[in-house]
């Protein structure tokens, strides 16, 4: 399978629209008609078209996939009237119960809600996508365009016989999602290697350690999102396999994707261990630097104790202190104080406590 850059994957093959086109994700024209992104199969390839709802009844387009990116109310209402499927108002929910996110209606309509990863440099996030499989057509609803969707559109256009029906579209999306997660994990490993080279060198100051901690925390967050993403994909595939909606070839493909996800699980666990090691090492270097500062103050305070004692002794107001009456008494006290400071420093230096 040829590899493609995720960030440069084209949005898709846009055939000439039947009427005035709008944005890439659909919209409405001045007359109020909606533009939809529909995908049809032609000679074993998947092609994307922007079709106006006002004339779709007169076209011969038989979509296999209808992709709704940030759909308007008019688009949802038209989809419901034209295809008899209800598009959910809110696709983002926090219910982790499988029965709430993966279920089948009495009429055979399948509903699946999955998370897909977006990693664009400094930030990463999971985007919820609602899938509805109705009458041989896959409907997908999401708030923004996804790298996984772009990759599938690119591959399905270039590779013949990659997709045969709507269920293949859904499986290929999950397959591309697993591959995208694997590529992102490789990027995390490369980033951690760079951090490791910086942290494990001989001298690490507090500034470098702080930058390393920031980078490690960012990679830990991304690794956690990937772990959650592949877990969600596994649950969706498991539901599809249990629902007996797949033929033998599709079932085997789903099992292969599950095996790929299992390998990603072990890799994320390895990266978590590496992140914890680098985190502990970085915090350890920060503690060492702080201990060096504390050691300097400790040595200085110990070295200044003897001259303080000498000054205290000669500051006592006793009559019988012969040195006070001698002309050399004051220089003698100063020299004694300097010697009492120098002697501990020389001793500490020989012991290696000043390093």
Predicted features and spans:
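Hydrophobic alpha-helical transmembrane segments and their immediately adjacent juxtamembrane loops
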Residues: 2, 7-10, 14-16, 20, ...
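General secondary-structure edge motif
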Residues: 59-60, 168, 210, 217, ...
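Long amphipathic alpha-helical coiled-coil segments
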Residues: 236-251, 278-289
């Amino acid at each position: 399978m040829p590899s493609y850059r995720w960030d440069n994957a084209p949005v898709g093959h846009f055939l000439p629209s039947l009427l005035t086109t709008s944005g890439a994700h659909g919209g409405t024209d001045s007359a109020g008609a909606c533009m939809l992104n529909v995908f049809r199969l032609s000679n074993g390839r998947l092609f994307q078209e922007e079709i106006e709802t006002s004339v779709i009844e007169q076209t011969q387009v038989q979509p296999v996939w209808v992709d709704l990116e940030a759909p308007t109310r008019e688009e949802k209402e038209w989809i419901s009237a034209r295809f008899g499927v209800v598009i959910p108002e809110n696709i983002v929910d926090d219910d982790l119960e499988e029965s709430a996110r993966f279920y089948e209606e009495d009429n055979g309509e399948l509903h699946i809600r999955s998370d897909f990863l977006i990693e664009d440099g400094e930030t990463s996030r999971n985007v919820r996508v609602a899938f509805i499989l109705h009458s041989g057509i896959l409907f997908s609803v999401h708030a923004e365009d996804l790298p996984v969707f772009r990759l599938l559109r690119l591959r399905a256009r270039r590779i013949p016989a990659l997709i045969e029906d709507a269920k293949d579209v859904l499986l290929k999306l999950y397959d591309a999602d697993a591959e995208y997660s694997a590529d992102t994990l490789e990027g995390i490993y490369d980033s951690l290697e760079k951090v490791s080279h910086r942290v494990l060198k001989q001298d690490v100051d507090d500034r470098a350690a702080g930058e390393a901690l920031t980078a490690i925390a960012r990679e830990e967050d991304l690794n956690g999102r990937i772990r959650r993403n592949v877990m969600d994909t596994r649950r969706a595939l498991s539901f599809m396999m249990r629902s007996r909606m797949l033929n033998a070839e599709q079932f085997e493909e789903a099992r292969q994707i599950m095996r790929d996800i299992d390998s990603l699980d072990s890799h994320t666990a390895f990266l978590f261990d590496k992140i914890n090691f680098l985190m502990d090492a970085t915090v350890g270097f920060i503690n060492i630097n702080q201990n060096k500062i504390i050691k300097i103050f400790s040595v200085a305070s110990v070295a200044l104790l003897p001259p303080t004692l000498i000054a205290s002794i000669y500051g006592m107001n006793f009559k019988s202190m012969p040195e006070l009456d001698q002309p050399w008494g004051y220089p003698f006290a100063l020299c004694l104080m300097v010697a009492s400071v120098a002697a501990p420093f020389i001793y500490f230096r020989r012991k290696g406590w000043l390093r």
